[in-house]
Amino acid sequence: MSSIYLELQETVARKHISRWLNEATVDSSAKPIMMTARYMNMETSLRVFCGYHIPDSAIEEINAKYWLITQSLELVNFPIPLPGTKVYKAIQARKLVMRWLELAAKKSKITIMQGGRPECMLDEWVFIMSEPGYKGRKDFSDYEMAQVIFSFLFASQDAMSSGLIYGFQHLADNPEVLAKVRREQDCVRMGNYEDPITLDQMDDMVYLQAVVKESMRVKPPVLMVYALIVIRPFSMIILIPFQ
């Protein structure tokens, strides 16, 4: 299944990077990258979760609507969903996104029922439930499956977009690190940059993996713990409890 995800991710990445390069030939001036990277990440997430059960025309619409949902979570917002408020717009956006995700769940069920092979997370979910030996719950409605994908999609936009942008900036700020990443790519892929990346090649990209981990350590996209006020200085000796 991981190879399916990798193929989807690479296809989307190549598509967006090619467009960026084409746009740069027309206008090479510096531009903000946040929304550009976010759009690529949104399409990547949708393809991994829903495959091509989501049409191309819907991706841009979902991307725009999800931004309204993100805006509604700002710290200072009018809390009552009156028309025109960010919270109201987010509620309407959620309804539209859910309709697309429910449609994707329905199409996935039809595809697997007709003997199709899994090509995304939804397909794999439906396929596993259809296996004779599966003893778990099987009666998930399209709406329930869409809710799960909606949650995954929100998490991917919150954390992954931030991590992607931070990683890009860290490479831009550290050209010597970028040069090492490129040397490793040339070695692992032997200069064949047009060939699809394989899982084995990904495993061999040890330096790239280290760069990603270090980027997340230096600038965590999402903090998993609350900040604490420390009265006394930290000790340089770190004790890790067993439990």
Name what the model sees in each region.
Residues 3-164, 180, 185:
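Cytochrome P450 heme-thiolate monooxygenase catalytic core
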Residues 10, 64-67, 116-124, 170-222, ...:
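Cytochrome P450 I-helix active-site segment
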Residues 32, 234-237:
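Eukaryotic intrinsically disordered and solvent-exposed regulatory patches
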Residues 47, 166-173:
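Short glycine/serine- and small hydrophobic-enriched flexible loop segments
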Residues 56-57, 224-227:
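Acidic/polar loop patches that form or flank catalytic/metal-binding clefts of enzymes
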Residues 74, 96, 217-225:
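N-terminal start-of-chain detector that recognizes signal peptides
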Residues 165, 228:
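Residue-level "edge-of-site" marker
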